[in-house]
Every structure is written in structure tokens, then in C-alpha cells.
């Protein structure tokens, strides 16, 4: 009672209430009521972010392995339907992971699949090799995207090495596990990866967290890949 929507033609009172429930009060207050998020309440400080210049690194070197991960965000509300495709370049000599690509945008499942396969082609053109492993979430009905990705990959002759991932641990705990990697410079970013950095700096209070979720997935895949291979010199 007593509530008045300033622009009812854009969002109804019901829409706003639903958004507040699905996105959380802190994210809603920041996005819709212009109440800024307190950085002290977030898990990642912008001062922790360390950067690299792609022009200064030879990603064609044999020591690099590439790990990808997709958070498709299928079935979520229309206001939070970003999908994230993160590609990490792991330097197996130093153990440092470079965020080679951070693609976070709104798109339909068919476009997600097409973009993943295009990144495989781009890796092969620019580095001489494709993904060592690519993780795709299979929670709930997201499994169908992984299956379709495999079929389309084979159809196009790419044969992407796909690993289905069913997440059972709380997302907040998973993303929080990135803290020491980011803080200690074990994960390096490009300065132009602004949306990923923004989502990290606002986690867990921001409206969107698809980028951090996919980053954690790629990081975890890379660690498992290293443990399963006869590599030396990894410092974590």
C-alpha cells in the first residue's frame, strides 16, 4: 500500500517485486533504486586485479594450455539472462592463468553454441591449438546444451573436448574460492574485460554473477587438468 511506480509502462509493480525476489535486495537496490553497493561488503577488491598485455605474451608457446567454461544461465529471469564463456590460458611453467577471453552477453542457446565453436577456431588460428578441455554446466535442463554442443562440434569437424559439469556446491562458496588466486596474481586479466571485472567487484551483491561463476569453472578445470598431466614447475 502507498507504493507508486514512476514508469509503469516499463515495469509494473509486480515486475519490480519479482525482480527484487529473484535478484536479491542488495542487487535490486543498486540497479533499480540507485543505491550503490558497499565495496566492503563484496568479496573482491578492485585493488587486487592484476593485468597483462596480450601483445607481450606469446600464447603460441608450447607451455600454454587453454581451458574454457560456459555458464549458459538458461531458465533464469529475463533480467538476468547473461551467458558467460570464459577462456583461460594456463602457463604450465609458472602456474599463472591468463584470462584470454571473457565473453559475457545476452544470447540464445544456438548463439552460445556458435560462439563457443568460433572461439575454438580462433584459438587454433591464433595459438596453433584449441581447448585442452571445455566445461559445460549440466545442472537441471542445461544438459541439453552440452549435448547439442557436442553434436554440432562433431558435425563441424572440431571435436571439442567437452566436460560436463554438475555443480553441487553453493555458488557463493565456489566463487569465493577465487579470492586467493585473484589477490595473489595467480589469475591475470586484460584491462578491457570490464564486465567480468565489474561482476567480480560487486560479488555477491551485484545483479549478475555469470562471469565469476564461469571463471571459477575454468580455473577448476585447469587445476584438474594439471593434476592429471605430467607437468612441472606449477606454483600455486
Which stretches of residues belong to each language-model region?
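Mg2+-dependent endonuclease catalytic cores in nucleic-acid-processing enzymes, primarily RNase H-like
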Residues: 1-9, 14-18, 35, 39-43, ...
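Helicase-core coupling region on the C-terminal RecA-like lobe
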Residues: 31-39, 211, 219, 235-236
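Flexible internal linker/loop segments at domain or repeat junctions
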Residues: 57-62, 90-96
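Generic detector of well-ordered alpha-helical packing
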Residues: 72, 138, 210-211
